């Protein structure tokens, strides 16, 4: 049986992504999880920014459809909601999430439970 990889390197952004989400957790738990994560001998994992999560989507399909799909080369495909590290500026008890079932970007309380998929590499903030 072929074993699934633990990471995936994005050829577009050169960021390395955690392949499997460990499940749902609060934003605070997600930060702790990322700080303790070690995959493939690397321990510099972090929660992605909202812009980094957005790089997984093919926004060009937005004109053909109501909701963009994940880019074709992204190997993990799901319709779950993921935490970003980006705090909502107007209400710091909230952070941005990306809902991949509709490519929605929304802010929710950091005490809510959403999935996390860690990333490593040069941070995209603009």
What is the predicted role of each segment?
Residues 1-45, 115-119:
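Extracellular adhesion/carbohydrate-recognition regions
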Residues 1-2, 75-76, 110-111:
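Short solvent-exposed loop/turn micro-motifs enriched in small/polar/acidic residues
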Residues 31-44, 50-99:
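An exposed tryptophan-centered "aromatic clamp" motif
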Residues 102-106:
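Short, P/G- and charge-enriched loop/turn segments at secondary-structure junctions
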Residues 16, 58-60, 107:
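A ubiquitous, low-specificity "background" feature that marks scattered single residues
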Residues 81, 107-126:
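Short, structured beta-strand segments at or near domain termini in extracellular proteins/domains
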């Amino acid at each position: 049986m072929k074993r699934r990889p633990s990471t995936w390197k994005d050829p577009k952004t050169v960021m390395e992504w955690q392949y499997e989400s460990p499940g749902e957790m609060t934003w605070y738990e997600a930060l702790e999880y990322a700080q303790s994560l070690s995959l493939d001998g690397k321990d510099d994992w972090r929660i992605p920014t909202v812009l980094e999560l957005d790089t997984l989507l093919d926004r060009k399909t937005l004109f053909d459809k109501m909701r963009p799909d994940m880019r074709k080369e992204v190997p993990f495909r799901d319709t779950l909601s993921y935490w970003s590290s980006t705090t909502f500026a107007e209400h710091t008890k909230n952070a941005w999430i990306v809902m991949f079932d509709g490519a929605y970007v929304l802010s929710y309380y950091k005490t809510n439970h959403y999935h996390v998929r860690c990333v490593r590499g040069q941070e995209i903030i603009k």
